[in-house]
């Protein structure tokens, strides 16, 4: 069995990172898990916060230390290419990629297209295998988009009209993947529709999915 603990993430972006690392380190000590075989920290980031929040660098700096290291963390960056109202990389950071900050600890980064579901799974599996083999941090940069605004009052179409014109015309990742499976004759179109209906029904009835 796998025990999963989700840390409470406040509105202060990325501040939960050292909390997760400290919790995992404590669990490793309690279990006598010196090599990180049984405890795995996973951090989910946004692209703008990952590059912009100082606590990210502070946490990375402790990654390989004897007193605070957790034998490698898997970082998942949800790169929706927009930080509030700034979408031009020339205005958001001084590096090409939002993940360039991990060069400070020489962690590998897998950049993957969020529209390719199987590629995302493969990259994540590869990242986990790297962590288990080398016991170092690793990053999966999922390049995708945000359909709606940052919150109920945010309308990105006002500040990013060109970007959101393209997003509005995008069918969605699920539809793209379903169409691909139908084209490959893996499933029928009716199967895809039934899966969506079944999932929504299960969620509305508070039943376990999968």
Regions found by a protein language model. Give the residues of each.
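Cofactor-binding active-site loop characterized by glycine-rich and histidine/acidic residues
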Residues: 1-106, 110
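Phosphate/diphosphate-binding loops
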Residues: 87-91, 102, 107-205
């Amino acid at each position: 069995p796998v025990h999963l603990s989700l840390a409470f993430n406040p509105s202060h972006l990325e501040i939960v990172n050292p909390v997760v690392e400290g919790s995992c380190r404590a669990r490793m000590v309690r279990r006598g898990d010196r090599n990180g075989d049984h405890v795995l920290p996973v951090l989910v980031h946004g692209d703008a916060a990952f590059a912009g929040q100082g606590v990210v660098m502070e946490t990375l700096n402790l990654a390989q230390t004897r007193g605070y290291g957790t034998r490698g963390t898997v970082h998942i960056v949800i790169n929706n290419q927009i930080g509030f109202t700034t979408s031009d990389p020339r205005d958001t950071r001084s590096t090409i990629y939002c993940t360039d900050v991990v060069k400070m600890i020489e962690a590998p980064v897998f950049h993957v297209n969020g529209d390719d579901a199987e590629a995302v799974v493969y990259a994540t599996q590869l990242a986990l295998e790297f962590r288990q083999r080398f016991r170092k941090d690793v990053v999966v940069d999922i390049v995708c988009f945000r359909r709606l605004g940052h919150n109920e009052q945010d309308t990105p179409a006002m500040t990013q009209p060109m970007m959101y014109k393209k997003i509005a015309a995008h069918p969605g990742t699920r539809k793209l993947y379903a169409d691909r499976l139908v084209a490959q004759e893996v499933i029928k179109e009716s199967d895809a529709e039934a899966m969506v209906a079944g999932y929504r029904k299960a969620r509305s009835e508070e039943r376990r999915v999968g």
